[in-house]
Amino acid sequence: MTRALLPVLASILIVGCRNASFPVEEHQAGVSGSDVVADPAPIPHYEVDPKWPKLPLGDRWITGGLGGMCIDERDHIFVLNRQDVVLEDLDGARPAAPVIELDPEGNVVRGWGDPERLGDRLHDCHVDAESNVWIVAAGTGVLQKYSNDGRELLLQIGETGKYDSSDGTREGEPQNSDRAQFFLPAAVDVDAQTGEIYVADGELPGGNHRIAVLDREGRFLRQWALERTEAERDVIPLPHCLRLSNDGLVYVCDRRADRIQVFDRDGAFVRNIDIPFEPLTSPDGRPSGTRGTAVALAFSTDPQQRYLFVVNQNSVMVDIVDRRSGEVLSSFGEGPGRYPGQFTLPHGIGVDSVGNVYVAEQEGRRIQKFRVATPTPMN
């Protein structure tokens, strides 16, 4: 069934680890709006691995901005390369493919992808339960599913060159229509049990502003908007990320509102998780807080998915959030910059099966690995 996109609503990875161990810092989480109190639990701590990935990257490859990333069951990392390289740099390097696959040690396995077929502004990817790689290019109106090695396009949802707009072009008005065509899609996830496909559709103003759900063949099923109160109706709804939790919930980055919104799988609103920040330098006379605190997210891989790992572009760090209470417990990263452990416009995040966190940077044009620091047994 479809929930109407009401005008008032105006629409609308990382991780702990699977059987991993963490240094222990006990905490008692605060009570959220839903009066849930988190149990005392160890908070993971991370340190950058300066020797990952291995260099040279491929055959002296150079990347453009990295739009997103995802990880498969072998802990192979797939990185989305936008290929917007500095042209003079090509005198000393070769352009990398749009999709780069790395093994856990940081070696390049392969590069693949046709830039024209994939589309503009590669934004997010997801590896499903059958190891297929789903790719979202935000500048298009389509979603694509590839074999794990990228050799076969298994499914395309939406028509290339068309947008879900009033005139079918990128200049038209967004329609948020009941069909499987998109307008500036941002993120994708696939329900491992049902095969249903969840798409955050509308990563920039002027595009759609909805969560769309499709069946495993790509047929439209339902949609809903980001939640807005009457007082929030002027906050532009930009669903910038989307991930499905093990307990049947949908987590969406409500970028302009600096929070994560949680829904059930039919679109019923559950709660907000605010992601705050305080500028370290006075915002007087300069832009401040414009990038957003909730840009990308991933869950810890323990069965309860105790933590959320949230890319915060305002503080330029990764926030570790207690998923039950919504409390920001700690953060890692050394703020803006290009030294190891710093970030330049981080845009994608993922976690492997042993708890290593990977962060892809758009302006930094690199991916960094953060490993669990000085682990101790986790009860």
Q: Model segments located where?
A:
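Bacterial N-terminal signal peptides that target proteins for export
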Residues: 1-6
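C-terminal motif of bacterial Sec signal peptides marking the signal peptidase cleavage site
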Residues: 15-16
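Eukaryotic scaffold repeat domains enriched in small/polar residues
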Residues: 19-379
